[in-house]
């Protein structure tokens, strides 16, 4: 399993500038994350930038005051670099080509992807080939900018902590009324759109109804909700089981689970040490057990 950060993407673009034509007139970003890659590229190359749909509807590429130092080309047919962050099956690439087809008489389009990770080869330039990580079902490349918004077949193989991931960490639950009021109205953080595999939370099972209601109200779909099997704080405390141990035990018993997403770094590290399986910490953006 390979984990790619935003810093990794910027580094890959910077280290591969020699692969990118420097005589293009502007850059088009394919929504959504392709715009992120295109923006970084436009900064490095000091080129005007526009997103795909704005270009289709007639808007002009822009780039701020720094572009006044850049000499524009006088060629009649402008060259545009069409950028996406990743290429796997090629759906977004094909849709972009279809949308841009009516403009081919006026523009020359060069298609570029930062990370080539799949079977589709219909691309002019790929900055980094990561297909060795995606050549079978057991391997995957995960990206910082969309790790919590994958499609269902990937998210279904993830286990999620709840507090600190889906919602802000609650106050000390020994103040029962304050804690109860908070988890009923917890402030949301990351809300996955696709159905996820399992939520593994150290919350007491006595709070199941409240937790299920909050998840439903915020559109979080899941296969399983696993909570600590105790009804009171004292009962859980007297068990001697730490949050990390509880989560690691569940993770170890799920052979199909490929990643645990945890909110707290010390717990993330402990879960990885106890299971030997990959763990991602959302608060520190650290990935344990990947490349």
Q: Model-found features: residue ranges?
A:
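Short hydrophobic/aromatic-enriched beta-strand-loop microsegments
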Residues: 46-54, 109, 222-227, 277-286
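Acidic, divalent-metal-coordinating active-site segment for phosphoryl/phosphodiester hydrolysis
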Residues: 87-94, 246, 251, 264-275
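Substrate-recognition element of Asp-dependent hydrolases with the DxDx(T/V) motif
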Residues: 190-212, 226
